[in-house]
């Protein structure tokens, strides 16, 4: 699905006029504070149900207001059966921060879960913070993998929620001064069964991702390609049943007061020469690696017939021309939708040297208003 129309109300400084976008590339430029990043943020809000910049919903509501609305029209690019009209969907989210109420709609019908919006509009953000996928802790890489797992395997979301609930119960018991071992084993059994199922799904999707990543990596002419190793760690050594691991480390978990083994400790381990790439790779190499990982994500979904909307915020500040060209070329090959922001007026010829410039729309953003050029 491509976002072909966006309309917001009381979202930061954006004006409420509807804007139509290209299903291919959209180039937005403007001075700092003009609202160009807010456009990406609104698109992300529509697909993620939250801001990718801040954690508080109040922060994105326009000054003096208590409620925001983001609406989008999506185009699959496909024709409906027995019709010459394209398949379109309309999705929207309204959030009243004073009443703490959220309304979600898909094609005019109320839905209860943000997952319905996310399934219609898979959004992948590439901004300065994304490079923490390599340099940051395991949680960043779990989040990266689980985004893909969610869009590949429909059962993942409910299974993950069950794991979270059981983990919370175990943690409460571990923090209890007097531990009931018989009851703890009951929770261990539930946790172990759910963890095995969840890890099976993660492992399957990871292997699909790894194949896509290696195909993208093979096109890169860099000396470190051969020595790079990527593996999935499920959160414990699966040669031993998780329930046994939990019993063997009961005192350790009790001292720490929370669950130390299982899917909440999963990681994508990236190593070069036997050491973590966060310790061995330069900042530039880490950026290249993250870009390739993001492209591989998009490739997995593209191979499944799903289109990702990529949001590239101020990449000129983080990526040199070579990296920008590599990213633009790969995204063009995926035939996905892309939004790119910059301070300077974009020059498409610098991204597509060979003259194979894709369809695009260009917008100047000033005081929250988008003007197409």
Curated annotation (Swiss-Prot):
<dbReference type="GO" id="GO:0000731">
    <property type="term" value="P:DNA synthesis involved in DNA repair"/>
</dbReference>
<dbReference type="InterPro" id="IPR001238">
    <property type="entry name" value="DNA-binding_RecF"/>
</dbReference>
<keyword id="KW-0238">DNA-binding</keyword>
<keyword id="KW-0963">Cytoplasm</keyword>
<dbReference type="GO" id="GO:0006302">
    <property type="term" value="P:double-strand break repair"/>
</dbReference>
<dbReference type="InterPro" id="IPR018078">
    <property type="entry name" value="DNA-binding_RecF_CS"/>
</dbReference>
<dbReference type="InterPro" id="IPR027417">
    <property type="entry name" value="P-loop_NTPase"/>
</dbReference>
<dbReference type="InterPro" id="IPR042174">
    <property type="entry name" value="RecF_2"/>
</dbReference>
<keyword id="KW-0235">DNA replication</keyword>
<dbReference type="GO" id="GO:0009432">
    <property type="term" value="P:SOS response"/>
</dbReference>
<dbReference type="GO" id="GO:0005737">
    <property type="term" value="C:cytoplasm"/>
</dbReference>
<keyword id="KW-0227">DNA damage</keyword>
<comment type="similarity">
    <text>Belongs to the RecF family.</text>
</comment>
<keyword id="KW-0547">Nucleotide-binding</keyword>
<keyword id="KW-0234">DNA repair</keyword>
<comment type="function">
    <text>The RecF protein is involved in DNA metabolism; it is required for DNA replication and normal SOS inducibility. RecF binds preferentially to single-stranded, linear DNA. It also seems to bind ATP.</text>
</comment>
<feature type="binding site">
    <location>
        <begin position="30"/>
        <end position="37"/>
    </location>
    <ligand>
        <name>ATP</name>
    </ligand>
</feature>
<dbReference type="GO" id="GO:0005524">
    <property type="term" value="F:ATP binding"/>
</dbReference>
<dbReference type="InterPro" id="IPR003395">
    <property type="entry name" value="RecF/RecN/SMC_N"/>
</dbReference>
<keyword id="KW-0742">SOS response</keyword>
<dbReference type="GO" id="GO:0006260">
    <property type="term" value="P:DNA replication"/>
</dbReference>
<dbReference type="GO" id="GO:0003697">
    <property type="term" value="F:single-stranded DNA binding"/>
</dbReference>
<protein>
    <recommendedName>
        <fullName>DNA replication and repair protein RecF</fullName>
    </recommendedName>
</protein>
<dbReference type="Pfam" id="PF02463">
    <property type="entry name" value="SMC_N"/>
</dbReference>
<keyword id="KW-0067">ATP-binding</keyword>
